[in-house]
Amino acid sequence: MAPHQKSRINRINSTRSVPLRLATGGVLATLLIGGVTAAATKKDIIVDVNGEQMSLVTMSGTVEGVLAQAGVELGDQDIVSPSLDSSISDEDTVTVRTAKQVALVVEGQIQNVTTTAVSVEDLLQEVGGITGADAVDADLSETIPESGLKVSVTKPKIISINDGGKVTYVSLAAQNVQEALELRDIELGAQDRINVPLDQQLKNNAAIQIDRVDNTEITETVSFDAEPTYVDDPEAPAGDETVVEEGAPGTKEVTRTVTTVNGQEESSTVINEVEITAAKPATISRGTKTVAANSVWDQLAQCESGGNWAINTGNGFSGGLQFHPQTWLAYGGGAFSGDASGASREQQISIAEKVQAAQGWGAWPACTASLGIR
């Protein structure tokens, strides 16, 4: 149906008169009576088309005649009140509601609706199932144009948002994750992380997790040690190390980037170092003396531990020569390791030589007897 421009309304004009020569008084009487009749049938009518009103003066006696005079053309699905064949009276209102095509999208599902509703609000009431908690992308008072309209409706969903470790459960009428964050006034920083794409469609019971990431540059002065200088000592057992000259730490300015996630440090990366004072390396004497294979000590270790120099069975003795912890530490083994199992073959033999010198072969009574060493 297409409303047209209001037709020109002819009105009785009393400002100008046309002199008539009347032959008889009977003719004059007839004209007078006709004029009174015309005035009596003139009606002031309001035509309301989709909320837009026009006033006109008509001589028509029916609604159909009034609409024809107003230039209103009706479509098959348009609604007229009163009906077209209804008689019309002075100061009546004729209401026309034209049929429009509306694409109604509810949660992504499209419905093509033919409606005579004037506004979006009227449409939603007509369709039903839409509540005040739903989000509508159009102004409820917006007039639906003749060309039609697309209206999207989003239902609320209960979701959880974990923002930097703080969890909130909310009901939001949002189409996607981005809209949900906007409704909660949540902004993401350039480094922040989120577990779902922002354009992902929001569903009931969705769980959104946001990790707040902060990168901070920290500069501090720290001490450092230089790599030691080693000097071989052929008289000391292999693996034996003795500090000949102490070193001294240096200092340097270190700049690093510290990344925190939800307030907890995740990583620290050095990006620059500037040496302030040089470090002095320590001088360490390192023994190179080895004990020949198949020595008496190897035979004794074979008897005591099956030749396993790293054994520690938890029975109170350890190492290839089965040192008791007190004996090991008393004769200097702590310089190599907390127990004999952590020391090398040569280091264990060097301690064993000290024990043998102090206690004799009786420190290993059973095995030295079976080997015929004593």
Swiss-Prot record:
Entry's localization field: Secreted; Cell surface
UniProt induction comment: Activated by RamA and repressed by RamB.
EC category name: hydrolase
Keywords: Glycoprotein, Hydrolase, Secreted, Signal
Ranges for region Disordered: 228-252
InterPro entries: DUF348, G5_dom, Lysozyme-like_dom_sf, RPF
Disulfide bond annotation, renumbered to this chain: none
EC number annotated for this UniProt entry: 3.-.-.-
GO MF entries: hydrolase activity
Deleted gene: phenotype: Not essential; a double rpf1-rpf2 disruption mutant is also viable. The double mutant displays a prolonged lag phase and slower growth after transfer of long-stored cells into fresh medium.
CDD domains xrefs: RPF
Residue ranges constituting the G5 domain according to the UniProt record: 210-290
An example Gene Ontology CC term for this record: cell surface
Signal peptide (residue range): 1-40
SUPFAM superfamilies per UniProt: Lysozyme-like
Post-translational modification comment from the UniProt entry: Glycosylated; by Pmt, by at least mannose and galactose. Other unidentified sugars may also be present. May be subject to proteolytic cleavage as multiple shorter forms are detected in gels.
Summary of the function given for this chain in its UniProt record: Factor that stimulates resuscitation of dormant cells. Has peptidoglycan (PG) hydrolytic activity. Active in the pM concentration range. Has little to no effect on actively-growing cells. PG fragments could either directly activate the resuscitation pathway of dormant bacteria or serve as a substrate for endogenous Rpf, resulting in low molecular weight products with resuscitation activity.
Family statement drawn from the similarity comment of this UniProt entry: Belongs to the transglycosylase family. Rpf subfamily.
Protein name: Resuscitation-promoting factor Rpf2
Gene source species: Corynebacterium glutamicum (strain ATCC 13032 / DSM 20300 / JCM 1318 / BCRC 11384 / CCUG 27702 / LMG 3730 / NBRC 12168 / NCIMB 10025 / NRRL B-2784 / 534)
Gene: rpf2
